From Swiss-Prot:
Keywords: Cell cycle, Cell division, Cell membrane, Cell shape, Cell wall biogenesis/degradation, Magnesium, Membrane, Metal-binding, Peptidoglycan synthesis, Transferase, Transmembrane, Transmembrane helix. One of its GO terms (biological process) is cell wall organization. GO terms for molecular function: metal ion binding; phospho-N-acetylmuramoyl-pentapeptide-transferase activity; UDP-N-acetylmuramoyl-L-alanyl-D-glutamyl-meso-2,6-diaminopimelyl-D-alanyl-D-alanine:undecaprenyl-phosphate transferase activity. Catalyzes the initial step of the lipid cycle reactions in the biosynthesis of the cell wall peptidoglycan: transfers peptidoglycan precursor phospho-MurNAc-pentapeptide from UDP-MurNAc-pentapeptide onto the lipid carrier undecaprenyl phosphate, yielding undecaprenyl-pyrophosphoryl-MurNAc-pentapeptide, known as lipid I. CDD domains: GT_MraY. This is Phospho-N-acetylmuramoyl-pentapeptide-transferase. It is found in: Cell membrane. Its cofactor is Mg(2+). Signal peptide: none annotated. InterPro entries: Glycosyl_transferase_4, PNAcMuramoyl-5peptid_Trfase, PNAcMuramoyl-5peptid_Trfase_CS.
Length: 369
């Protein structure tokens, strides 16, 4: 618990101090956001706002995680160091962040709304996702438990939904596909949500907060631990270190949100949204709560569905629309809601999804107790 407090405190401080310094750097270089003309007219005033703020979040997370383990080692040389699960998750976050950084840089340098084309972006995301999936199935601990498994999970692995039903090789291939679906869905969900000042950052704070609580609980109730509760114990690799990383992510985003809230001094850009989405997907996979992510990240799912419905209905009806504009947050803007009103109400909605997800997580343990 001390490590979580140290890590969160460091991440908050790094993001709070680092973000304004990064803003000054971007302003000097003229790296500002390009705003589409077909978006809400109220957004035109945001043209030129510094972007790529996700760089600060990623840097704060990496620095805080490393420093926390260094401090814990200095306090107690026998304390466990960085875990395989956390390092693999950090790889996914950084890899996706680099894809987003490249996308942002192209937009800024060419002053257009399109960065990487869809095909190139998907290929790069898939490449990072494949490497993550392969790494996650390897590096077993002394008991043979790897960071991830081929079983699809809800609150824990579901033994009757094992992708390795046709053998180890087929299971590994299917896991790579399944893992990439989760990563792609999460990254695109956060990316679509990042359309209003503070919306994606605030919603993500709550999601990472949920994974912090779940990681602590999984550690307390780990199979083989003194506090194990029979059939309700969890077989998760490095749950407490994952909880530390989730707490660091949440705190770093709070620090960034201080500058990203309306009126935003900086945007996270695709650098941030893809890194955050990748991290969220990584937590779901490594904490064995893959299907539960659909509820905990329900706000991202809802916003993504609004785009799918809008595009599908538009094509099916020859130009008609369900919403005034998609993603969903812009629909309410065009209905006359103030941007801050939309953001706060969507935060409330996101918080409710997180609460329901946590309720399901703990209720399942009570049932198995």
């Amino acid at each position: 618990m001390i490590a979580l407090l140290i890590g969160a405190g460091l991440a908050l401080l790094c993001a709070l101090v680092g973000t304004p310094l990064f803003i000054r750097l971007l302003v000097r270089r003229g790296y500002g956001q390009f705003i589409r003309d077909d978006g809400p007219t109220s957004h035109h005033t945001k043209r030129g706002t510094p972007t790529m703020g996700g760089t600060v979040v990623v840097a704060a997370v990496l620095l805080s995680y490393g420093l926390t383990h260094l401090i814990m080692f200095l306090m107690n040389p026998d304390s466990p160091g960085p875990s395989a699960s956390a390092l693999i998750l950090l790889f996914l976050m950084v890899g996706m962040g680099l894809v987003g950084f490249l996308d942002d840089f192209i937009k800024i340098s060419r002053q257009r709304s399109l960065g990487l084309n869809a095909k190139a972006k998907l290929i790069l995301q898939a490449a990072v996702g494949v490497i993550f999936a392969v790494l996650a199935l390897n590096f077993p601990d002394e008991s043979g438990l790897a960071p991830a498994s081929t079983k699809i999970s809800l609150v824990r692995d579901l033994p009757w939904l094992d992708l390795a039903f046709g053998g180890t090789v087929l299971g590994a291939i299917l896991f790579v596909v399944w893992s990439n679906l989760i990563v792609t869905a999460a990254t695109n969900g956060v990316n679509l949500t990042d359309g209003l000042d503070g919306l994606a950052a605030g919603a993500s704070v709550m999601v990472f907060g949920a994974y912090t609580l779940m990681g602590i609980w999984q550690s307390n109730q780990a199979c083989g631990s003194p506090r194990e509760a029979g059939s309700g114990c969890y077989s998760v690799r490095d749950p407490l270190d994952l909880a530390l990383l989730a707490a660091i992510m949440s705190a770093a985003l709070v620090g960034f949100l201080w500058w990203n809230t309306s009126p935003a001094k900086i945007f996270m850009g695709d650098t941030g949204s893809l890194a955050i989405g990748g991290a969220i997907a990584g937590f779901a996979i490594l904490s064995r709560t893959e299907l539960l992510l659909g509820i905990i990240g329900g706000l991202f799912v809802l916003i993504t569905l609004s785009v799918i419905i809008q595009v599908g209905y538009f094509k099916a009806t020859g130009g008609k629309r369900v919403f005034k504009m998609a993603p969903l947050q812009h629909h309410f803007e065009l209905k006359g809601w103030a941007e801050v009103t939309v953001v706060v109400r969507f935060w409330i909605l996101g918080g409710l999804f997180v609460a329901v997800g946590l309720g399901i997580f703990y209720a399942e343990w009570v049932v198995l107790l």
